[in-house]
């Protein structure tokens, strides 16, 4: 919107602004200037304005959340697998120890009977 000092450009400067920008002049300044529409910037609205990548968009946050959830799930699954694998190995070694004890006890009983 023009202020009190701004006036729309005359026919001489109608095509001065690009990409839908609106041309204005200030009587005390010889050159025109532009009010750019959304997503354009520059003296003549010639540059596309890209939003800063430092502000994460909603889709970026969603993607980051999905990646984090997948990584967390994989980590938990790996820990469960390792715990089960370790538990099975411990159970096998306990059974082996029990077998050895039973075998030793059986031998001891047999050797006592032989004497």
Swiss-Prot record:
| GO MF, one annotated term | receptor ligand activity
Residues on the membrane's Cytoplasmic side span 84-115
What transmembrane ranges does the database entry give? 63-83
| Tissues of expression | Highly expressed in pancreas; weakly expressed in muscle.
The record's listing under Gene3D superfamilies reads: Laminin
Residues on the membrane's Extracellular side span 1-62
Keywords of the record, alphabetical order, are:
Cell membrane, Disulfide bond, EGF-like domain, Glycoprotein, Growth factor, Membrane, Secreted, Transmembrane, Transmembrane helix
Q: Which residues are glycosylated?
A: 39, 60
Query: What modifications does the entry list under PTM / processing?
Result: Proteolytic cleavage close to the plasma membrane on the external face leads to the release of the soluble growth factor form.
**InterPro entries listed in its UniProt record:** EGF-like_dom (IPR000742)
Q: Which cysteines are joined by disulfide bonds?
A: 9-23, 17-34, 36-45
As for what it does, the entry says: Low affinity ligand for the ERBB4 tyrosine kinase receptor. Concomitantly recruits ERBB1 and ERBB2 coreceptors, resulting in ligand-stimulated tyrosine phosphorylation and activation of the ERBB receptors. Does not bind to the ERBB1, ERBB2 and ERBB3 receptors.
- Read off the domain note: The cytoplasmic domain may be involved in the regulation of trafficking and proteolytic processing. Regulation of the proteolytic processing involves initial intracellular domain dimerization.
Q: What is the name of this protein?
A: Pro-neuregulin-4, membrane-bound isoform
According to its UniProt entry, this protein's organism is Mus musculus (Mouse)
């Amino acid at each position: 919107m023009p202020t009190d000092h701004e006036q729309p450009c005359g026919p001489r400067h109608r095509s001065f602004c690009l990409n839908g920008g609106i041309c204005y002049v200030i009587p005390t300044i010889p050159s025109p200037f532009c009010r750019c529409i959304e997503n354009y910037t520059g003296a003549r609205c010639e540059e596309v304005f890209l939003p800063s990548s430092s502000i994460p968009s909603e889709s970026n946050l969603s993607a980051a959340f999905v990646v984090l959830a997948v990584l967390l799930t994989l980590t938990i699954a790996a820990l469960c697998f390792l715990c089960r694998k370790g538990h099975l190995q411990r159970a096998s070694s306990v059974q082996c120890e029990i077998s050895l004890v039973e075998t030793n006890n059986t031998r001891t009983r047999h050797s006592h009977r032989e004497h």
